[in-house]
């Protein structure tokens, strides 16, 4: 079975969030089920500089504002992934963030940049590469939302049955919204600009295009699949998603054990397994405390936070709960960037409690590994969280997740309640209500369990035994593909 994945990010070449981890890990996981995957990406500088053995497939005349477009088939160093790259310098050859300028303002022509991505995907689905034609095209998030629309448009124009499409929502809150006036530049049928198409409250929505035109929709956890069908989490698309509930699947993301594995992680102070976790984590913790300038206290409960600094991630709650941690002798290490006001608040807290709180603004993949290995608790207090990967990394490294009961966090972390402790299923700490009071109670329960060393070790061992790799999730995705291919035959 041949599957084309269409996305804007791919780890380790280009990553701004968890999307990149998923698009890198899913194709190799699907290979175990006989799926021949290729990936299509925009020609951002990171991709152009990373590819090797490139072959020019076709040169396309000016389109979507791009003066010159070359489509290459290439390899990525140290992987087996075949990748198609759209080299259109006038659209993609820009430094830094792939979506926004140096002032963090979204590029005004993003609609053209990602329309080209969708249009090329449709051409590949029709046989642009004479040697490889996909049976399924699987697009990811709003950047690739127009992929199913262009494929459907081709089907309507030709009268021929098109390949089947799958669209994955990684985060419904980012929708790719543009003024209605841009529709004329997208080269799509006029009938697509309607409520039954791209129109969304007087705007054009790339996300809605994917949700409406794809044959099947997946999102990244069972709970999130339910949440986005109701008003509170539906971002205005809950009606469409509820209408399509029979085509909507919640499939958890997984952890790539080649990258996230304490037994062989070369980025952490020492390797460890579930049998050597006590001594291993103690060494990683000391190394982290030394690196970040914290007091070197083995018995201090260390809370790690690796996140984008946004209101969605629950950082406003955490600010209010800092005193609860420091007053009990706990420590905090935070890695992240985002909202400037939040950055300033956390930097001020680190200055005030320099031996208890350390903050590193920015994103550093290596430091993320060190924080997750060296912390006792990994905090993910998000207001909403489609899946979340950080808590899965925490489970893998024996770093107990403290999470809000929402989305994928609710699906993957089992609270250390008395009942769950008694039956040996507890893996972390879960708070139900998105409030400072509820978060504070969870923090107190973490301290209480930490003081009961035997119970803490049991929960940590259970956490590390959780099956959070891609194996079972890839099988579920494969079954969706298989059913679609059967429908098309």
UniProtKB/Swiss-Prot annotation:
Keywords from the named record: Glycogen biosynthesis, Glycosyltransferase, Transferase
Pathway annotation from the record: Glycan biosynthesis; glycogen biosynthesis
GO molecular function terms listed in the Swiss-Prot or TrEMBL record: alpha-1,4-glucan glucosyltransferase (ADP-glucose donor) activity; alpha-1,4-glucan glucosyltransferase (UDP-glucose donor) activity
Annotated ADP-alpha-D-glucose binding sites: 15
EC number(s) recorded for this UniProt protein: 2.4.1.21
Root EC class: transferase
Catalytic function, reaction form: [(1->4)-alpha-D-glucosyl](n) + ADP-alpha-D-glucose = [(1->4)-alpha-D-glucosyl](n+1) + ADP + H(+)
GO BP terms: glycogen biosynthetic process
UniProt keyword Acetylation present: no
HAMAP family documented for this protein: Glycogen_synth
Biological role stated in the UniProt entry: Synthesizes alpha-1,4-glucan chains using ADP-glucose.
Protein name (database record): Glycogen synthase
Organism in which the protein naturally occurs: Francisella tularensis subsp. tularensis (strain SCHU S4 / Schu 4)
Upper taxonomic lineage: Bacteria, Pseudomonadati, Pseudomonadota, Gammaproteobacteria, Thiotrichales
